[in-house]
């Protein structure tokens, strides 16, 4: 696979002027454990390919390293965030929701975190779905539950209406948890936001039991789904093997 033609640039909404409220280390030093925008993770780790790129004078294709920055764009005390889970359910969805809410609340001091119910339908007024006000007490034991507290839905929704909803509610960051279809929708939403000149960040979080998302080596939910399916297959095999002409149905 050739990586040199892949654009991994992440656009920014503007200058980063606000000091991150995240406290790192016992002395609260702001430069400790923060990630710089120039930190990178290589896409291709094969030595021969890297040497060839050096010979050809090409830059290494790499992703920005994930992690907290010392300076941020939004003021967390005034920021409003939205979460949505789309597509098929898979193991780990509630864990994702819980982790995001707890980090935003305790790490960044945010108090306006909203969960849109039933996938992209939650943004469309005609469906009249409720919006959840997500707090730490709401997600305290969420990791012990299967499925998604926000529910889900399949199929496309009008992108313009989704962006209209984000604009009406003054949402600054949208977290979209889903598979390849959801991430394609996230791209369309981000493009529409850019065309309108809005200051909204779209964050795509890959999840799928199919593990078929491009550039993602292992997606959330894949291992658990594989383990559970294996147990079911083994049980059916053992049962059917114990009888003449036995057949196991999964």
Predicted region positions:
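Short, acidic/small-residue loops that bind anionic groups at enzyme active sites
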Residues: 190-219, 223-230
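Glycine-rich oxoanion-binding loops at beta->alpha junctions
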Residues: 37-74, 122-172, 183, 220-227, ...
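Polyanion-binding loop/helix "lid" in catalytic or ligand-binding cores
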Residues: 230-250
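Solvent-exposed alpha-helices and their adjacent loops that cap or buttress functional pockets
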Residues: 72-77, 82, 106-108, 140-144, ...
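N-terminal low-complexity/intrinsically disordered extensions
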Residues: 1-79, 106-109, 141-142
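Short internal beta-strands
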Residues: 110-119, 204
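Short Gly/Thr/Asp-enriched flexible loops that form oxyanion-binding sites at enzyme active sites
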Residues: 96-100, 181-197
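Short glycine-rich or small-residue beta-strand-to-loop segments that form or flank ligand, phosphate
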Residues: 80-90, 148-151, 172-178, 204, ...
